[in-house]
A protein has these predicted regions:
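Active-site environment of divalent metal-dependent phosphoester hydrolases
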Residues: 17, 64-68, 89-91, 129, ...
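Metallo-beta-lactamase
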Residues: 86-140
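Conserved beta-strand hairpin/beta-sheet module of binuclear metal-dependent hydrolase folds
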Residues: 4-48, 131-147, 165
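Structured catalytic core of nucleotide-sugar glycosyltransferases
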Residues: 10-20, 61-71, 121
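Active-site metal-binding motif and surrounding structural segment of the metallo-beta-lactamase
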Residues: 38-84
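Active-site neighborhood of phospho(di)ester-bond hydrolases with catalytic His/Asp-centered motifs
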Residues: 31-35, 55-63, 83-86, 144-147, ...
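Metal-dependent catalytic neighborhoods of phosphoester/phosphodiester hydrolases
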Residues: 69-78, 93-96, 227-234
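Cap/insert and terminal regions of metallo-dependent hydrolase folds
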Residues: 154-249
Length: 250
């Protein structure tokens, strides 16, 4: 993982098969999503020296399995509060994904205290109710995590502005998607305004944010079938280079 400042954004795993990240400041941290099994997630936390007792809660972006697959077993073994939009919490509760004893807390737009952190949710354009998170850390930094969005709407633009770090979806390369094995309906879903953000769309937004003063970025939720890390990075470098911006690879 990468250390950006005292507060850290750490991707535990990311991609089509599962997504989870950590926002950490000192000994306290938040988990955002848990899309792989409890063994994978627990091993990733242990490798970072993170004890569950130091976690202030789990933030859930939406109900898709690549974001919640590991929650059920993890929460049977560990007692942590879960935060999210009302529709997502209702889904988790009604489908038995979270234990009946689990504390569920709605986050609906205004900033709320989640342990040592200030957390504000904002809606993203996806094919189920979905949110991103703007997080204020105890050391005064601001991070925004925005994945699973087909288009950059005004609430997303607002949430991405003025951050110390932005973790933004760079899901697919358009050529790989259109020339790949996916059936038409699935390609259309991914490309739609309720699907996912392409490398080109992500890169254009990163250029805007750099021009506004943001300096730290993480590319997230890369498709294993329709993208590669090298291609996502090269798209960013090409976009920035065309604008005369020289990026640093961290």
């Amino acid at each position: 993982y990468q250390r950006f400042f005292m507060a850290e954004f750490i991707s535990l795993y990311s991609g089509s098969s599962g997504n989870s990240s950590v926002v950490r400041c000192g000994q306290r941290y938040l988990i955002v999503d848990m899309g792989k099994g409890v063994r994978t997630t627990s091993a990733a936390l242990k490798a970072l020296g993170l004890a569950v007792s130091d976690c202030d809660g789990i933030l859930v972006t939406h109900e898709h399995s690549d974001h919640v697959k590991g929650l059920s077993t993890f929460l049977k073994k560990n007692t942590l509060p879960v935060y999210g939009a009302a529709a997502t919490l209702d889904f988790l509760d009604s489908n038995g994904i979270v234990p009946a004893s689990c504390e569920l807390h709605e986050l609906e737009g205004r900033e709320e205290d989640v342990g040592a952190f200030g957390v504000q949710s904002f809606p993203t354009s996806h094919d189920v109710p979905c949110v991103g998170y703007r997080i204020h850390t105890p050391d005064g930094k601001t991070m925004t995590i925005a994945t699973d969005l087909g288009v950059l709407t005004p609430p997303v633009h607002e949430a991405l502005s003025g951050c110390d770090l932005v973790a933004l979806e760079s899901n697919y390369d358009l050529h790989m998607l259109r020339s790949g094995p996916y059936p038409y309906y699935l390609r259309a879903r991914i490309e739609s305004t309720r699907g996912h953000l392409s490398n080109d769309e992500c890169s254009a937004k990163l250029l805007e944010l750099i021009q506004e003063g943001c300096k730290k970025f993480a590319l997230c939720h890369l498709s294993q079938e329709n993208n590669t890390p090298a291609l996502a990075l090269q798209t960013v470098f090409n976009t920035l280079g065309a604008a005369g911006v020289v990026p640093e690879k961290d």
